[in-house]
Amino acid sequence: MDVLVIDVGGTHVKILATGQTEKREFDSGPKMTAQQMVAGVRKLAGDWSYHVVSIGYPGPVLHHRPVADPKNLGPGWMGFDFRKAFGRPVKVTNDAAMQALGSYKKGKMLFLGLGTGLGSTLIIDGIVEPMELGHLPYKKATYEDYVGERGLERLGKKKWRKEVFDVADRLVAALEPDDIVLGGGNAKILKELPPGCRLGDNENAFKGGFLMWAEAPRSESPAGRAGPAVATKLRPTVRSKRS
């Protein structure tokens, strides 16, 4: 089964399909709607063959459907029929969860995605729990306001790096993971990593997208496992968005 993986971000939409060696991308931005995203993907992947679609979505997801419009994109994502738009079966998960799934090794792993915002996912013994930690209160705003793109632009790289260390330290102390992965496009700006952290490969978002359609054993539902190496269960934790 050939899979088309779509990684939707605040600045770019990146795609890769089974059997392809190079990803393709186009610009997104604060006005991009779900319909525009689909149109862009269909055009860019027009010469690719695929049977199913995985979408990494920058916001909370429940039962493979967005439950809130993304903070850094346009409107029209909630209730959008991706299956009808692509004409194929579609699974949607939080974008950080998709990259976390591709980064997971074992035990209890915390994934933090440093990009337009702050993506976050906890995986415990293969069970994937997407989270919205970026919207939790921090100092005078939220975690995302300090370590997301807005924080980087406002603070500058030196102060931003210090905030990343502080946020990582607080979340690690609260969640006590065995493994901490820092991913997202801005992770490369870090000169060094917080203690106990490893740098994630952003290509793992595509790996996670492929795993979403891996065949499940008979004892579990098709949505219940990501493959023989990782027992995954996509169970998004839905939080209301903070204004």
PLM region descriptions:
Residues 2-39, 124-154, 225:
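Short glycine-rich, Thr/Ser-proximal phosphate-binding strand/loop in the N-terminal lobe
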Residues 3-7, 52-54, 109-113, 181:
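Short glycine-aspartate micro-motif
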Residues 12, 171-203:
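Glycine-rich phosphate-binding loops at beta-strand->alpha-helix junctions
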Residues 13-17, 59, 101, 118-123:
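Short beta-strand scaffold segments in enzyme catalytic cores
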Residues 25, 29-42, 46-54, 59-108, ...:
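Glycine-rich phosphate-binding loop and adjoining helix at the ATP-binding site
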Residues 160-173:
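A short, acidic, amphipathic alpha-helical segment used as a generic capping/interface helix at domain edges
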Residues 221-231, 235:
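Short, low-complexity intrinsically disordered segments enriched in A/P/G/S/L with frequent Arg
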Residues 233-243:
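Long, low-complexity, intrinsically disordered segments
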